[in-house]
Structures are given as C-alpha cells and as structure tokens.
Amino acid sequence: VFNEFFETPENSPARKRPGIYDVRYFEEGGKRLQVLLLDTRYFRGPIVLLPKRGRNGPYDRNLDPEVTVLGGAQWKWLEEELQKPADIRIIATSIQFLPVDHNWELWQNFPHERQRMLDLLRETKTGPVIFVSGDRHMGELMELPAGDKQSPGSPVYEMTTSGLTNAGGGQKGEPNRYRVSPTNFQSRNFGLLQIDWATQLVTMQLCDIDGKVVDEYKADLSQ
C-alpha cells in the first residue's frame, strides 16, 4: 500500500524486500544529494516500559544486544549506500536519533543500535550528515559537535518537525543536550532545508503553519 500511494517505481528494489526503506538521489550543477529513507518500525524489537511513567516519557532502555531497530538486511543496505558518492547526505528516520535525555520513542530506547549508527558513520567516513525526524509532535534543531566524545569525527545534525495537523507533544523545554535553540517549538510546524552548494552550508529551518520561520540553524557540511 505504501509503495502504491507514494508511486515507488515498479522496478525499485524497495518493492521486492520486507519493509519500506529506500534511497533517493538529486543532482544540481554537478552536486549530488543523497536522501536515505530508513524504516525504523518493521524490523524493530520490543520497547521496554519504565516501572513508573515519568515526566519525560514512559519508555526505558532495551539493553538486549540482540534486539534491533533496522534489522540485519537494512543495516547491510545502509552500509553499502553510505559508501556511494554524495556531496550531502540526509538520513530520514521516523524517530529521533540524537536525543538521549527523554523517554519517549527514540533511537536511545536501544542504545546499542544508536551507537552502531554512530560507529557506521565513522567507519564509512561519511562526513557530516543531517537526520530529519518526526514522531514527537513538536519541532527542534540539534547538533552533535565534531568534538563531542560520541561524535563519529564529523558533526551530526538533526531537525525534528511535528505533523502538519497535530502538535503539542512532550514538554516545553524538555531536556535535550543537543538542542541548539533555547527551547522546542510546540505548535504545528514544518521543516525546510536550504542548501548552499558553494559553501556546503545547509540552513535548517522550522516554520509555523503560516510559513514564518520560527527557528533556524546553519549546518556546516564542509567539515
């Protein structure tokens, strides 16, 4: 149903395998943009509940090293794709990747899988990447700096946006050590990425439902 609705080409490998992960390429003026679309639901193991729900969410960390987010085949595919040439890479994930301070759905529900992603970015020498995510019913902009002990060697950026019809998730100003703006944006919003190919700067923008920019941050992908 997903492939039919989004008109996935009939000859696409995405139609012949479990899950809905895929990749798209866009080229302009000799520059190449790679957009990796991950499936973080189909293969994901169980989420563990906290004994008592806290202010920042109901989920605990699943420390079972055998539990996966992407599944073996998708991890292998991702490693192969990250080694293909691209000037800028964007990774789309339905759940937040960088945050580690809340207990809603996020990659940190499975710390070993989040670390596996960072290790893969380091091993493939991918360079700076931008994650785009949703699920949280709010918006925020983030950066894992190159100098951070968890960094894969280059900065990792993330833009989370709400749905177009629903917002108000989480807590205003909930903890997030990687957020680069004073707080999160609780009203309905959408995101824009403005790419300057000459400087390798990507301006991440959060916009309200009227199109007004309410937050922005420049991601330096030349590092």
Regions found by a protein language model. Give the residues of each.
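Long, structured stretches of catalytic cores involved in phosphate-ester chemistry, encompassing
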Residues: V1-Q223
